[in-house]
């Protein structure tokens, strides 16, 4: 299964390797479709591929870290 989402990183999380952590800790493949990152905000269009349960775990991880997740 594939799912595309927009991620909006708050200032506090911009420099954290959250995409790396998701790829390492969950059985999902991440594909950055588009991104714009500054010191104040990070905007990422991301495609997640994997089992639905693993994709949901990855999304919940982002939310717990303060990232806004919106479906595309």
PLM features: residue spans?
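Long, contiguous binding/interaction regions
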Residues: 1-43, 47-72
């Amino acid at each position: 299964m594939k799912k595309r989402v927009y991620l909006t990183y708050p200032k506090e999380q911009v420099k954290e390797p959250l995409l790396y952590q998701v790829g390492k800790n969950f059985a999902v493949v991440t594909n950055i479709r588009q991104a714009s990152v500054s010191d104040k905000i990070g905007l990422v269009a991301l495609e997640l591929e994997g089992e639905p349960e693993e994709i949901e775990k990855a999304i919940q991880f982002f939310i717990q870290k303060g990232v806004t997740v919106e479906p595309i």
